[in-house]
């Protein structure tokens, strides 16, 4: 691919100039002739296209041509008499001339922001790197130098893409060739450039008399111009540059960095800019400046996606209706022109024209019917996942329209109906298929298209009421159209990219026999993690997966060059403003659902978990989790039971049942420790206090108080020489029967939940699982004074506990800052009390309590409750902490051994198994050992009742 050039526009201003619609295409290998104009695609489309290349590990085979509309704020409307033509007339477009600059930047065209007066010609120069517009060429040259570009300037006329290095020569070309043609084009209301082999700019008037509605045509042999009544879509604004010396530079604030990840982080500051898109890099060794040019296709066809407005009236500031003509460019490297083939017409109550020269299949999903079918990144991700990586040239294109903030929710838009039936069930009245030689004409009276035995329908405005009766009701939880904040935009960009890359490639295996079930919308039950309409779209994505691999799945499209679909819609108002947003509203819907669920405590891991669960889910997933279609049995294997949703394997069927709970989401405001479901966030916070250690135990002999009864008992025994029986008698809480011999626990009922509660017989620790209390009980019988309150992990080294707590960072009510502070305080305090009495050590460390207000005190690690061992054990632990990296002192083992009395023990860093107490100085040995307890670990983390798990068998 040849090095592209940045563009500065040289534009002749004309009064009748109304609008222009540009399209993104293949960059010409010669600067003499540029065949197509490029427009900025939807950022979400850009993200998905880039990530689909990563997932499929192949080069891009597509070049999307996406027609967009955008009203011009300063364009004056002119009422022109409609000619007696079949098509809807369009305004004349006088395309501007341009100034081009050589650099390592992709070529981008911009339309003028200002219009000259009706009389006379004014040359304007516009920089392609930003929006800067000037009537002086010298001023623009100085401006371009500010971008760090020092190469020579190349001028280009954007009307016919003729290039020249002489300013006078190109200005004369614009005046002579385009001045007299303006009036002719105004009267004819249409224009088109000639073949790319011509160096002159000629214009012809073209009419499409066969199409009564909006004509959309694709021609493989000619370059194109696109006409519309609205002003052209602004091209991609290159807000970052890749310097020759290997540095990335932000053009907004001149920020420079040497790594791509630093530039992505810096993009937070500019996420709200209109033309600022989140940087997505194709690969690490590709220069950043070649981002746009990466869309150029290898030898192969060009896939075009065109969304046309239906027969309903389109209102753009009282302007005329729209005519769109798009022609895809040919491969300029071919020496001989391609032969014109017969065209295939597909009529979906609108006119659609196709060219049959390509083998790629195009899938189009429109989300403009946002209120009836909320769009979803999950559907986009699933379409990328379900696409066959072995099919060369297969293209997945997701088309989304960003609604303006001023658009009302009651507007009628085009709706994509996902009713799917087997091709054999299609009645003759629904579709009439005629085949004559190489010309295949499909007439679908019911707005259906036959794609490899699969019927996909797009409903017109008459079918909307019928669809509403079938259950596609407006979602009340859908957020209103609003502009996202900078942090939301960039955070969602990151999550979209991360989720699509990390999504599991293995999709649910569906057969052709399953298509009949998914075809009926009424049979699709709502999933706990997804709305019903999203489940319908997800089912459509999964249905397409087996069809792509089947031999008969693409028979109806094997000869199709590109697929153009006209989607009817109702009247649509287009506002003046442009949405300052980076991606679609669907991602905002996902994050707002999680925000409502977790009361603004959702983390990135929660959102990624939401995306992955929704992508993995199937209709009625709660019941299917226990079915054989999710658990795969592999005979003669060491671990015969395998989860289809992930890579988990187990030799015990009960353990795999427990593991499946990982893929089941919690209900809104459900307690993460037990099964209690609160009504709101305040109710959940009040409930969480029952799981927290918030009670204060006052010593009857002195002024000291403790958060745990075991601390009080040890304090009274060591400081006041009281026996254990007296300690129990002086406590503030009556005891329930205990069994101290084996450390067994007492079962009791919890008023706040229907779950059974297990209580420790030594202290008042309670848990909903027997295993949790059993692991807790080891604290009173071991010399490991630090424990994890989430899973029962115990250790004698505070840094080990700090490292362990990262495993629970995704917990909804986990407060890492609070836990980390408590551990650091325990380390610093225990380091300062070397040589002091163990009693004072316990008193000072008792400050590490949980915060009952935040509702996360169950997750907070309190080291004081565990420092209740003998004096030798406590002092030994303190000496071990002297060796920790977080301690300021640097005593060696020899010094500690010499300072310690003969009866004192000192600890070394050990890795402890939280299930059976196995210890090892090697972390690898512990990980190998922990494989034996996979099922129990899952049970502990999920805090589920062991008896309930056995009942599910």
UniProtKB/Swiss-Prot annotation:
Highest taxon of the lineage: Eukaryota
One GO MF term attached to the UniProt entry: DNA binding
Any one of the GO BP annotations: positive regulation of transcription by RNA polymerase II
Zinc finger residue extent: C2H2-type: 125-147, 155-185, 248-270, 641-663, 669-691, 697-720, 758-780, 786-808, 911-933
InterPro entries from the UniProt entry: Zinc_finger/UBP_domain (IPR050688), Znf_C2H2_sf (IPR036236), Znf_C2H2_type (IPR013087)
Phosphoserine PTM positions: 95, 427
SUPFAM superfamilies, alphabetized: beta-beta-alpha zinc fingers
Keyword Phosphoprotein part of the UniProt annotation: yes
Annotated region (Disordered), positions in chain: 470-489, 831-891
Biased composition, class Polar residues, residue ranges: 854-891
Gene3D superfamilies: Classic Zinc Finger
Gene Ontology cellular component annotations, sorted alphabetically: nucleus
SMART domains hit by this protein: ZnF_C2H2 (SM00355)
Annotated PROSITE patterns: ZINC_FINGER_C2H2_1, ZINC_FINGER_C2H2_2
Compartments, as annotated in UniProt: Nucleus
Keywords recorded for this protein, A-Z: DNA-binding, Metal-binding, Nucleus, Phosphoprotein, Repeat, Transcription, Transcription regulation, Zinc, Zinc-finger
One matching Pfam family: zf-C2H2
Purpose of the protein: May be involved in transcriptional regulation.
Family: Belongs to the krueppel C2H2-type zinc-finger protein family.
Protein's recorded name: Zinc finger protein 507
Encoding gene per record: ZNF507
